[in-house]
């Protein structure tokens, strides 16, 4: 029996998501130690002590189900951003939410729109529900918003826009986003995926929550895996108008956020100083990457995230493999249609030093 023959038609066209190679896997494969992983845009600075304390206090309660509605976390988010708890949907990471949006608002025959070189989860969820992929060609590695507007049709139900974008790091300004929203029909849902927004400077950051008051078709999606350092716990949240949130929570699986994640999320979201320190350290180390690339005449895409994408002007797979042998894991992105590029997460200073040394050896820089 070939079970693919009875699978959902959309599933047949999918390939499994390829995450960044784990350190333990490389240790097994090559028998090397002191490996540096700069592949998954994780927070190298960890998470604050307040979150660790909150997790330990929760351990004795793990025989009980978590709060299915995430009351305390919703209250924390609402207070922090000036929204109402009934506007919030919680997810098992923002990936969970990105899939939830598609299941709630699109079905077979509907169009879901996103940019070329956008987060690979967008096409995955689109194909999984048999919706129509509407990939808009990129403009300077980023979103061509006019291209989105031109491509709109009566079948368009959902638009995903990551800002900053992953894996390219491009960034749209508040004005660009508002001008775009003003042209999108009210019956088309726009998802603003802000997983990396905390790495932008406060003065340039999009005030997306204020846009909710004007555009009822907007959903803001955020993650606590990046700047907040909770990637292993899987927790994210979406903010929208209450009617949309109600629909999302009808589809959302019960108990989709575990007790430890909910508890740690409350702690980290109350620790602004920690996140500010993480963002500032990221900017310092990002400048080192930019200086390294400029010194060695490597083209890169300017990034507002916690990663940088380098164009090697040749197939990057051999460079990736050579870096693995040097004990450095980065991210090949041929699956994004960028076979000449590698994406490198910004790490601790000593981790970045190891990358600079390894790449210099691989490319034989003087």
UniProtKB/Swiss-Prot annotation:
The modified positions for N6-(pyridoxal phosphate)lysine read 226
Gene Ontology molecular functions: histidinol-phosphate transaminase activity; pyridoxal phosphate binding
Q: Which reaction does it catalyse?
A: L-histidinol phosphate + 2-oxoglutarate = 3-(imidazol-4-yl)-2-oxopropyl phosphate + L-glutamate
Listed EC numbers:
2.6.1.9
Listed PROSITE patterns: AA_TRANSFER_CLASS_1
Give the Pfam families listed for this entry.
Aminotran_1_2
Output the PANTHER family linked to this UniProt entry: HISTIDINOL-PHOSPHATE AMINOTRANSFERASE (PTHR43643:SF3), HISTIDINOL-PHOSPHATE AMINOTRANSFERASE 2 (PTHR43643)
Q: Which InterPro entries match?
A: Aminotransferase_I/II_large (IPR004839), HisP_aminotrans (IPR005861), HistidinolP_aminotransfase (IPR050106), NHTrfase_class1_PyrdxlP-BS (IPR004838), PyrdxlP-dep_Trfase (IPR015424), PyrdxlP-dep_Trfase_major (IPR015421), PyrdxlP-dep_Trfase_small (IPR015422)
User: Which BP terms in the Gene Ontology apply to this protein?
Assistant: L-histidine biosynthetic process
Cofactor annotation:
pyridoxal 5'-phosphate
Keywords, A to Z, come to:
Amino-acid biosynthesis, Aminotransferase, Histidine biosynthesis, Pyridoxal phosphate, Transferase
The protein's name in its UniProt record? Histidinol-phosphate aminotransferase 2
| Record note on quaternary structure | Homodimer.
Concerning its family, UniProt says: Belongs to the class-II pyridoxal-phosphate-dependent aminotransferase family. Histidinol-phosphate aminotransferase subfamily.
Does the keyword Plastid feature in the UniProt annotation?
A: no
Q: In which pathway does it act?
A: Amino-acid biosynthesis; L-histidine biosynthesis; L-histidine from 5-phospho-alpha-D-ribose 1-diphosphate: step 7/9
Q: What lineage, starting at the top, does this entry show?
A: Bacteria, Pseudomonadati, Pseudomonadota, Gammaproteobacteria, Pasteurellales
């Amino acid at each position: 029996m070939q079970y693919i023959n009875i699978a959902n038609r959309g599933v047949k066209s999918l390939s499994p998501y390829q995450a960044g190679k784990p350190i333990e896997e490389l240790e097994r494969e090559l028998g090397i130690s002191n490996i540096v992983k700069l592949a998954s845009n994780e927070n190298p600075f960890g998470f604050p002590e307040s979150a660790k304390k909150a997790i330990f206090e929760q351990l004795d309660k793990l025989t009980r189900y978590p709060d299915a509605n995430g009351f305390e976390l919703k209250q924390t988010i609402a207070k922090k951003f000036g929204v109402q708890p009934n506007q919030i949907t919680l997810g098992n990471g923002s990936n969970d939410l990105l899939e939830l949006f598609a299941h709630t608002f699109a079905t077979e025959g509907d169009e879901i729109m996103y940019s070329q070189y956008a987060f690979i989860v967008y096409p995955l969820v689109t194909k999984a529900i048999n919706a129509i992929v509407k990939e808009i060609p990129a403009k300077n590695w980023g979103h061509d918003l006019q291209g989105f507007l031109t491509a709109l049709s009566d079948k368009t139900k959902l638009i995903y826009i990551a800002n900053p974008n992953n894996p390219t790091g491009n960034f749209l300004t508040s004005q660009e986003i508002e001008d775009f929203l003003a042209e999108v029909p009210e019956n088309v849902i726009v998802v603003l995926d802000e997983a990396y927004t905390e790495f932008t400077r406060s003065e340039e950051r999009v005030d997306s929550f204020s846009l909710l008051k004007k555009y009822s078709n907007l959903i803001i999606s955020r993650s606590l895996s990046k700047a907040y350092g909770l990637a292993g716990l899987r927790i994210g949240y979406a903010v929208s108008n209450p009617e949309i949130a109600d629909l999302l929570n009808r589809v959302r699986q019960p108990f989709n956020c575990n007790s430890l994640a909910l508890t740690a999320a409350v702690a980290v979201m109350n620790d602004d100083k920690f996140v500010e320190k993480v963002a500032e350290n990221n900017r310092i180390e990002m400048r080192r990457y930019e200086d390294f690339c400029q010194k060695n005449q490597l083209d890169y895409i300017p990034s507002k995230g916690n990663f940088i994408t380098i164009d090697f002007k040749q197939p990057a797979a051999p460079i990736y493999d050579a870096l693995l042998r040097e004990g450095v894991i980065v991210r090949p992105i041929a699956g994004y249609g960028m076979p000449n590029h590698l994406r490198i997460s910004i790490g601790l200073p000593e981790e970045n030093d190891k990358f600079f040394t390894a790449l210099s050896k691989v490319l034989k820089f003087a």
